[in-house]
A protein has these predicted regions:
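Conserved mid-core segment of classical short-chain dehydrogenase/reductases
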Residues: 63, 86-97
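The beta1-alpha1 cofactor-binding region of Rossmann-like NAD(H)/NADP(H)-dependent oxidoreductases
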Residues: 53-65, 97
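Conserved glycine-rich cofactor-binding loop
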Residues: 7-11
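Hydrophobic/aromatic anchor residues within beta-strands of the central parallel beta-sheet
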Residues: 49-51
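Conserved glycine-rich Rossmann-like NAD(P)H-binding loop of the short-chain dehydrogenase/reductase
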Residues: 23-39
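Aromatic pocket-lining residues of Rossmann-like dinucleotide-binding sites
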Residues: 20
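Glycine-rich phosphate-binding loop signature in dinucleotide/nucleotide-binding domains
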Residues: 69-75
C-alpha cells in the first residue's frame, strides 16, 4: 500500500511509520523540522519510501508536498493526517471559573 503520513518524525507518527515500514508499505513520510529520525528509518529502505518536508501552516507548502508525493507515489492509497498546527493561546482562556 502507498501511504502519505504527516507528522511522522516523532511520537505517534514515528511509531506508525516504523510499523508501516516493517509491513513493507511504500511511504511518503512528512516532517517539518526533524529529518534525522526519518533518515535513520529510511536508511536501508527497499520500497521507494521517502521523506518530505513541509510546514503545514503554509498552504503553498502543503500543495507542494501533495504534488511531490503524487509525482513519486502516483496517488497514495491511504493518507494519515497525524500532524497538526496550533496557535499559541493563553491557557487561562481555557479554564472555567
Amino acid at each position: 500500500m502507498k501511504v502519505l503520513l504527516t507528522g511522522s518524525s516523532k511520537g505517534i507518527g514515528y511509531k506508525i511509520a516504523k510499523d508501516l515500514k516493517a509491513e513493507g508499505h511504500m511511504l511518503a513520510l512528512h516532517y517539518n523540522k526533524n529529518e534525522s529520525t526519518l533518515e535513520a528509518l529510511l536508511k536501508e529502505d527497499k520500497t521507494g519510501s521517502f521523506s518530505i518536508q513541509a510546514d503545514l501552516s503554509q498552504q503553498e507548502e502543503v500543495k507542494k508536498m501533495v504534488v511531490n508525493t503524487i509525482d513519486k507515489l502516483s496517488f497514495p492509497d491511504c493518507i494519515i493526517n497525524n500532524a497538526g498546527i496550533a496557535e499559541s493561546a493563553n491557557i487561562s482562556l481555557a479554564v472555567s471559573y
